[in-house]
UniProtKB/Swiss-Prot annotation:
This is Large ribosomal subunit protein uL29. Pfam families: Ribosomal_L29. One of its GO terms (biological process) is translation. One of its GO terms (cellular component) is cytosolic large ribosomal subunit. GO terms for molecular function: structural constituent of ribosome. Keywords: Ribonucleoprotein, Ribosomal protein. Belongs to the universal ribosomal protein uL29 family. Gene3D superfamilies: 1.10.287.310. It comes from Acidiphilium cryptum (strain JF-5). InterPro entries: Ribosomal_protein_uL29, Ribosomal_uL29, Ribosomal_uL29_CS, Ribosomal_uL29_sf.
Length: 68
């Protein structure tokens, strides 16, 4: 799980890369769940929340740029 303070230090390009990586992780976790290979089901929730954190910070930056 990534903290919001760690995410805020990243550049926009790093955020996009991080978002793509998290989406891939979500996809892999969904496949593992569907095939019955997943042992730790809380990983899906953690990945989903990390995606939400990244998107929230991207939206905050977009709003700040629009105001400026």
């Amino acid at each position: 799980m990534t903290k919001a303070t760690d995410i805020r230090t990243k550049t926009p390009d790093e955020l996009n890369d991080m978002l793509l990586e998290l989406k891939r992780e979500q996809l892999n976790l969904r496949f593992q769940r569907a095939t019955g290979q997943q042992e730790n089901t809380s990983q899906i929730r953690k990945a989903r929340r990390d995606v939400a954190r990244v998107k929230t910070i991207q939206a905050e930056r977009a709003r700040a740029a629009a105001k400026a």
